[in-house]
């Protein structure tokens, strides 16, 4: 990355200071071509462990490895120049101890060029967040529905629907802010919970199925673009149907190949005459 590119990229400080005056625009990205398209429009690009399901067809995020995250994180950094790039720490790469988390995060930052890491967990991860931030690792925390804990909570269900769950999420949010997280993702909660957390914190709260009151929003880009099949979460708004368009393009290509219409003369190289 050139010095000019580095200077133009949004920093974690800029994201932290976005609390209040506007909305943080965040999307997922897993590849350089997609990052290139999203970069002019997004404040933050998240290389999420959702890539396990979106890119690799895994049934959950649990099979994603640190090496996978690093490879895709580096690709997104290479494909972008403006957005702040944040990379998820995958399941099993940070839960054992704060030192394990630091070693994983250090690899991510050093090998990708990303600006920060994201990790799931509430009060129980506050010590780890504090350990990381004290050692120069910027952290985005993630609470509410936490996909890495899907087996513990019994599936992908909205969180904070009861009073005790609402209070737990608020305690998680406050503990993570105190630990030094510069932003917080709140996923799939009751709307009132997302609103309450946003109002209670001084750091930006980025919602995904949380509340329009959040300081920003994030979606899985392939869901937003209509590339994820028929079923998408209720909180997703689809702004295109690129899956259908890709299918139609592939159909036209197949028809041309089978009919001998492609490649046409304009797609072929002629033999050059000797001078």
From Swiss-Prot:
Its cofactor is Mg(2+). Keywords: Cytoplasm, Magnesium, Metal-binding, Pantothenate biosynthesis, Transferase. It is found in: Cytoplasm. Pfam families: Pantoate_transf. GO terms for cellular component: cytoplasm. The active site is at residue 187. 3-methyl-2-oxobutanoate binds at residues 49-50, 88, 118. CDD domains: KPHMT-like (cd06557). The keyword Transferase applies. It is an enzyme of class 2 (transferase). Binds 1 Mg(2+) ion per subunit. Gene3D superfamilies: Phosphoenolpyruvate-binding domains. Catalyzes the reversible reaction in which hydroxymethyl group from 5,10-methylenetetrahydrofolate is transferred onto alpha-ketoisovalerate to form ketopantoate. Belongs to the PanB family. Homodecamer; pentamer of dimers. This is 3-methyl-2-oxobutanoate hydroxymethyltransferase. It comes from Bordetella petrii (strain ATCC BAA-461 / DSM 12804 / CCUG 43448). The gene is panB.
């Amino acid at each position: 990355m050139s010095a000019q590119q580095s200077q133009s990229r949004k920093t974690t400080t800029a994201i932290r200071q976005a609390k209040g005056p506007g909305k943080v625009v965040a999307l997922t990205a897993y590849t350089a071509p997609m990052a290139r398209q999203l970069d002019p429009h997004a404040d933050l690009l998240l290389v999420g462990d959702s890539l396990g399901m979106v890119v690799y067809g895994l049934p959950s995020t649990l099979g994603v490895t640190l090496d996978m995250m690093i490879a895709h994180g580096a690709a997104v950094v290479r494909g972008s120049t403006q957005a702040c790039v944040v990379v998820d720490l995958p399941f099993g790469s940070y839960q054992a101890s704060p030192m394990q988390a630091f070693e994983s995060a250090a690899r991510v930052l050093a090998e990708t060029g990303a600006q920060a890491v994201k990790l799931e967990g509430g009060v129980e991860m506050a010590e780890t967040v504090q350990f990381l931030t004290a050692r120069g690792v910027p952290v985005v925390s993630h609470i509410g529905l936490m996909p890495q804990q899907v087996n513990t909570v019994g599936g992908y269900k909205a969180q904070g629907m009861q009073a005790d769950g609402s209070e737990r999420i608020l305690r998680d949010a406050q503990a993570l802010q105190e630990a030094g997280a510069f932003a917080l993702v709140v996923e799939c909660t009751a709307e009132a919970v997302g609103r309450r957390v946003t109002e209670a914190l001084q750091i930006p709260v980025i919602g995904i199925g949380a509340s329009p009151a959040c300081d920003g929003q994030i979606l899985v880009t392939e869901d937003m673009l209509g590339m994820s099949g028929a079923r998408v979460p209720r909180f997703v708004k689809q702004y295109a149907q690129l899956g259908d368009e890709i299918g139609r393009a592939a159909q036209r290509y197949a028809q041309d190949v089978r009919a001998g219409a492609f490649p046409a003369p304009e797609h072929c190289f002629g033999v050059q005459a000797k001078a």
